[in-house]
Amino acid sequence: MSTKKTKSPSKKASKKATGKKPSAPSVAKGSKSSYAKAGVDVALGNRVKSGIGALVRPTHGAEVLGGIGGFGGLFRPDFKKRGIKDPVLVSSVDGVGTKLKIAFATDNHDTIGADLVNHCVNDIAVTGAMPLFFLDYIAAAKLDPRVLKEIITGLSRACKEARCALIGGETAQMPGLYGEGEYDLAGSITGIVDRKDLLDGSRVKPGDALVGLPSNGLHTNGYSLARKVLFDLLGLKLSDRPAGLGTTVGAELLKVHRSYLPTFRKLHAMKGKPLHAAAHITGGGLIDNLPRILPKGCDAVIDPGSWKVPAIFGIIGRGGNVDPLEMYQVFNMGIGMVLVVPGKEGEKIAKTLGGKVIGGVVKGSGIVRFFPEPGN
């Protein structure tokens, strides 16, 4: 058997033979690939994704290694610069849910990415973590260059505001799975916290105060019920302005999920580290999210009259004849984040952060109680 190594034609030889600069193999110009005929246009996908790098690069810092397009995003955290001695990584993954339907209907896609990033940022912030990096997932029947650019722009803007690097993602074409003009959007975030600063609910005790931070609307939860009531039962249009709402239905439903990261940065800088725990009020509302941070032997008692509930929730509750307690289990009802702090510091912290003391922690069995019972 011959052991002589066979040489492959060099680029120089190839160019000399053909008189042309060699290029990557591709389907003949003017013809359509079999894959494209099946609904997946690889060439279109490559063209669409070619401009992503310029959009996400502003989110990168010295800790990001390499660029976009590799098999994996590379991130080397500088623990020393961050002042972290015993690092704990915190990860979360989420989607935007049926709020996407509003983006489709209004053809407005530049805020939905911020919804996703802010939701994920808040989810890890309640553990005491600060964001490191983010990855996104976008899937559609067919990629629309304009829509994709708007989505990525929103993602990048929110990541930059959160000091979080957008280091990669997946963009998939799935014909037959999604409707024309529709897509799905999800993302994963990883953050970091020093173990001594980890918030896990263990510091919560009877006598603590509950400080509620205001939401600006539905955020990213309860849209299936909201759409059912507003559009099917009440017959409203996106351009309608119901009494008391102050804006159109479409504008109200597209309000960007608020990021509470600036508030957490302020809290971490306070003397004495007053934050005992925090709960992001998302799907499940106050009723299901507060128990996630309550230790055994503690209940959360909420006064639903201690803050002003935004008009949109009243419109949905009355319009759909929804049980008042169910409203507090589906929607945030105007409270997007709850902080657990020492009772004697509750009012001061609430005033400093623009929130309200909405209740307190008492002895109990790990549930949420309302006093008085909420009503529409």
What are these regions (language model features)?
Residues G30-I52:
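Short, low-complexity N-terminal leaders and the immediately following helix N-cap/first helix
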Residues V40, L44, I112, N221, ...:
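A generic structural signal for residues located within well-ordered alpha-helices
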Residues V93, D184, D197-G250, I287:
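Short, acidic (Asp/Glu-rich) active-site segment that either coordinates a divalent metal cofactor
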Residues A43, A54-N216:
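Glycine-rich phosphate/pyrophosphate-binding loop regions near the starts of catalytic domains
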Residues S2-K7, K11-K15, K20-K21, K29-K37, ...:
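Glycine-/charge-enriched secondary-structure boundary and capping motifs
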Residues V48, I52, L74, C120-V121, ...:
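Buried hydrophobic packing segments
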